[in-house]
């Protein structure tokens, strides 16, 4: 199943997602999230972006892996009830990020180059990973969604003001995208 993406302005994107009860059957939802993410040509997708306020996100960073081989089990990841740890000291890197919920708006976001994340995988096995570079960036972006933070929140006030009309157009559903979006009217 392909879910419609929840756009900027919907209140669910500003909420803290609820932890998921250990052992909950998520397999169908997880597969649908990967299908939805791929249909929208995304690198990651958080459950709030499909209208589910739960602590779950999926990522696929295979386009950024330089080994020449796509290894689905290695690059397609599921993160349930994640806890992100930032290494100190850490190097901050900048990169222009997009977001499926805010189409057409790209923001230079400072992120930690290296992070550690503790989570449950799709089989409810506790995991811990150290991530660097693009995988670390994608995980930080999706993790932010679980706490109501969007990539535009990293903008200076003057830059955000310049984007006000574009953001309002997205909020009102006046945006063209090649994937399904859901405009429910539950605005912030």
Swiss-Prot record:
UniProt function note: Removes the formyl group from the N-terminal Met of newly synthesized proteins. Requires at least a dipeptide for an efficient rate of reaction. N-terminal L-methionine is a prerequisite for activity but the enzyme has broad specificity at other positions.
Reaction(s) catalysed by this chain's protein: N-terminal N-formyl-L-methionyl-[peptide] + H2O = N-terminal L-methionyl-[peptide] + formate
GO biological process: co-translational protein modification; translation
Catalytic site positions: 142
Cofactor(s) listed: Fe(2+)
InterPro entries in the cross-refs: Peptide_deformylase, Peptide_deformylase_sf
Lineage summary: Bacteria, Pseudomonadati, Bacteroidota, Cytophagia, Cytophagales
Top-level taxonomic group: Bacteria
EC number(s) per entry: 3.5.1.88
Protein name: Peptide deformylase
Source organism of this protein record: Amoebophilus asiaticus (strain 5a2)
């Amino acid at each position: 199943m392909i879910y419609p993406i929840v756009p900027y302005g919907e209140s669910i994107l500003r909420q803290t997602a609820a932890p998921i009860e250990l052992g909950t059957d998520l397999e169908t939802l997880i597969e649908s999230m990967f299908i939805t993410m791929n249909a929208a040509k995304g690198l990651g997708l958080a459950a709030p972006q499909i209208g589910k306020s739960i602590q779950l996100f999926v990522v696929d960073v295979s386009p950024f892996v330089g080994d020449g081989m796509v290894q689905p089990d290695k690059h397609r990841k599921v993160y349930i009830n994640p806890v992100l740890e930032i290494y100190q000291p850490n190097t901050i890197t900048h990169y222009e990020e997009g977001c499926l919920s805010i189409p057409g708006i790209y923001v230079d976001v400072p992120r930690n180059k290296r992070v550690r994340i503790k989570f449950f995988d799709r089989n409810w096995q506790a995991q811990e990973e150290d991530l660097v570079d693009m995988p670390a960036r994608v995980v930080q972006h999706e993790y932010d969604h679980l706490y109501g933070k969007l990539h535009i929140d990293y903008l200076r006030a003057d830059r955000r003001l310049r984007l006000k009309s574009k953001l309002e157009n997205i909020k009102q559903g006046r945006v063209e995208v090649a994937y399904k979006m859901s405009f429910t009217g539950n605005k912030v």
